[in-house]
Amino acid sequence: MECPNCHKNASRVIDSRPSDENRAIRRRRECENCGFRFTTFERVERSPLLVIKNDGTREAFNRDKILHGVMMAAQKRPISSEQLDTLVDHVENEIRKQGLNEISSKDIGNLVMKELANLDDVAYIRFASIYRQFKDVSGFMEAMEDMMAKHDKE
């Protein structure tokens, strides 16, 4: 690894440990040329994931957009930020498990709704009202009936 101080390619690892909840490895290095110590991180490089929007355009997957959407739906609900982070992790992991390079925004929305339905009914309905773009009360009532039918099965 190149030393950021003297730019020579001679360094050795003097310490290595897990970081970022085991998603990275933190390595402490020392340059064998000048003795400068520096830190590097090693992470798994995931293949880029593209989202196919409703208009057919493509954009890079952005977990922060999903997190923002579920945070808006969960406003003033007894849901912690950790629960929302976990929800978004589940959605992203489910997408990556499918092994696809592209996924439609509709499929992402369905995954989010599935996760929200298991977390909080009100947040689910709020998210569904925006995601499904209800045109009238009947669409909203249909989502409510779906939620109530789910509870009847439990």
UniProtKB/Swiss-Prot annotation:
Residues 1-22 are annotated as: Disordered. InterPro entries: ATP-cone_dom, NrdR-like_N, RNR_NrdR-like. GO terms for biological process: negative regulation of DNA-templated transcription. The keyword Metal-binding applies. The keyword tRNA processing does not apply. Keywords: ATP-binding, DNA-binding, Metal-binding, Nucleotide-binding, Repressor, Transcription, Transcription regulation, Zinc, Zinc-finger. It comes from the Bacteria. A zinc finger (unnamed) spans 3-34. Its cofactor is Zn(2+). One of its GO terms (molecular function) is DNA binding. Coiled coil: none annotated. Binds 1 zinc ion. Belongs to the NrdR family. PANTHER family: TRANSCRIPTIONAL REPRESSOR NRDR (PTHR30455:SF2). Negatively regulates transcription of bacterial ribonucleotide reductase nrd genes and operons by binding to NrdR-boxes. This is Transcriptional repressor NrdR. It comes from Lactobacillus gasseri (strain ATCC 33323 / DSM 20243 / BCRC 14619 / CIP 102991 / JCM 1131 / KCTC 3163 / NCIMB 11718 / NCTC 13722 / AM63). The lineage of its organism: Bacteria, Bacillati, Bacillota, Bacilli, Lactobacillales.
